[in-house]
Amino acid sequence: MSKKFTMTLLSSSLAGLLVMSGGVSAQNGTYSVLQDDSQKSGPVKYGSTYEVVKTVDNGNFRYEVKEKKNDKRTLFKFDSEGNVTVKGKGITHTLHDPALKDFARTAEGKKNEQNGNTPPHKLTDSAVRGVYNKVYGLEKTEITGFSVEDGENGKVSLGSDAKASGEFSVAVGNGARATEKASTAVGSWAAADGKQSTALGVGTYAYANASTALGSVAFVDNTATYGTAAGNRAKVDKDATEGTALGAKATVTNKNSVALGANSVTTRDNEVYIGYKTGTESDKTYGTRVLGGLSDGTRNSDAATVGQLNRKVGGVYDDVKARITVESEKQKKYTDQKTSEVNEKVEARTTVGVDSDGKLTRAEGATKTIAVNDGLVALSGRTDRIDYAVGAIDGRVTRNTQSIEKNSKAIAANTRTLQQHSARLDSQQRQINENHKEMKRAAAQSAALTGLFQPYSVGKFNATAAVGGYSDQQALAVGVGYRFNEQTAAKAGVAFSDGDASWNVGVNFEF
């Protein structure tokens, strides 16, 4: 050790004295502190204001800084790592100073020998005054609104009137409360009153067990177990167990249902509803959204796209058109055939002529001549048969025409149905695009939260901010933390992106 690092024994009778008492050994020595100008040039100078007393307790070194005057008043104590433990009002702080650590390493022989005019350590009068001023300030600092309960079921509360009464509960914010086991409330007047419940945001309420409320004034009813409400004034209402409300003023009133999007309201159990409420409580009118970006459905439970329906209906239309064409050709051929047969029969008729007295004057195409009246009767009968045949043909043509009209109406109805499906699919496409943006915002928020720092120094609060991004979305995260001692620290963070928010709260235990 350097000769410049002098050690002055209080008296020769104390040199090498070893005192044994109750199994604890102690060895005392007094060390000098450097003057402020000793590190500039010239011989090393030692001050007359402060001294350091070294003790050894079961192999652990402790150093006590005292004034040389004023009855050797103790200013502070530090360990071999340069840490000063300060007991303030309501909390214990740990202060670290590099000059103290350098002094301890020199006193314990852990530094290389110093030669010439180089000071053996960095502890000067001004360094002692600086540390003492910090110690004095911390001793006089009173922290209110902060509480940590020691033990296996520790509870943490931070903020005016904050209350954490459940096991492993955390309450952060003015008037925040966490009353059940493993509950967490972060934000002014946030309330987590269910077991394993989480409330994050100003005025959020997570009343049910295993419920989560995120966003200003988000609410989960105490009967809606496993409910999740995320968004400004989002709500999971009475008996809506396992309900999820995502979006500003989204409301779930049914079991195992999801209200997706701002102002969306569920209408039945086991439903995902993306429509939004547009009217008052009395008229209960709803708007629609487009769910976009869908692939063609392949299973019976999958949604079909407009393109998929168009292709299917196009095939049906082509098939119907082909069948109508074939049937029309058949009917035309049949009509032509029957008309030809009638024409042949008409051409084979018997032509007769009569005079003014009604007597037969000629008979063409007949093997026998008959009376005019008989001939007219026979001709009338043949004409009736011709009329009957033509009437039958007209009936068939009429039926074909009716069938064609019926098919045309069916095709028109199918076209209207396709147009309705197209409108619904357009709404679904728009909603999927919004969901895609929401997922990218969530990823950006997660990246920002990852960038928040944990407090490292004991007794120190830290406020930290970070930014994160994913694809074309960015997020800002802010957080606070506090290290209670070398083994325990806690932090909380909130990330914001385009009106959405996510959060985390963590407690760290080191062994």
Swiss-Prot record:
Residues 461-511 are annotated as: Translocator domain. GO terms for biological process: protein secretion by the type V secretion system. Residues 329-344 are annotated as: Required to bind IgA. Residues 1-26 form the signal peptide. It is found in: Cell surface; Cell outer membrane. The keyword Glycoprotein does not apply. Residues 27-417 are annotated as: Surface exposed passenger domain. Residues 376-441 are annotated as: Left-handed coiled-coil (LHcc). Residues 304-349 are annotated as: Right-handed coiled-coil (RHcc). Induction: In strain ECOR 9 expression is greater at 37 than 27 degrees Celsius and increases upon entry into stationary phase (at protein level). Upon expression from a plasmid in strain AB1157 (with its own leader sequence) more protein is seen at 37 than 27 degrees Celsius (at protein level). Its main location: other. The chain crosses the membrane at residues 461-471, 474-485, 488-497, 501-511. The keyword Transmembrane applies. GO terms for cellular component: cell outer membrane; cell surface. Residues 27-460 are extracellular. Keywords: Cell outer membrane, Coiled coil, Membrane, Protein transport, Signal, Transmembrane, Transmembrane beta strand, Transport. GO terms for molecular function: identical protein binding. Residues 288-303 are annotated as: Neck. Residues 304-349, 376-441 form a coiled coil. InterPro entries: Adhesin_Head_dom, Pilin-like, Serralysin-like_metalloprot_C, YadA_C. Pfam families: YadA_anchor, YadA_head. Binds (in a non-immune fashion) to the Fc portion of human IgA and IgG; binding occurs on the cell surface. Confers the ability to survive exposure to human serum exposure. Binds to the Fc portion of human IgG, IgA and to whole mouse antibodies also via Fc. Upon overexpression cells acquire an extra cell surface layer that forms a zipper-like contact between cells; cells autoagglutinate and form biofilm more readily, suggesting it may play a role in defense against a host. The signal peptide, cleaved at the inner membrane, guides the autotransporter protein to the periplasmic space. Then, trimerization and insertion of the C-terminal translocator domain in the outer membrane forms a hydrophilic pore for the translocation of the passenger domain to the bacterial cell surface. The crystallized passenger domain (residues 161-440) is an entwined, elongated trimer with a head domain, a neck and 2 extended coiled-coil regions of differing handedness separated by a saddle region. Belongs to the autotransporter-2 (AT-2) (TC 1.B.40) family. Eib subfamily. Homotrimer; can probably form mixed heterotrimers in vivo. Will form mixed heterotrimers with EibA or EibC; these are correctly located in the outer membrane and bind IgG Fc, although less well than homotrimers. In denaturing gels runs as a band of about 210 kDa. Binds the Fc portion of immunoglobulins; binds more than 1 Fc per subunit, can be modeled to bind 3 Fc per trimer. This is Immunoglobulin-binding protein EibD. The gene is eibD.
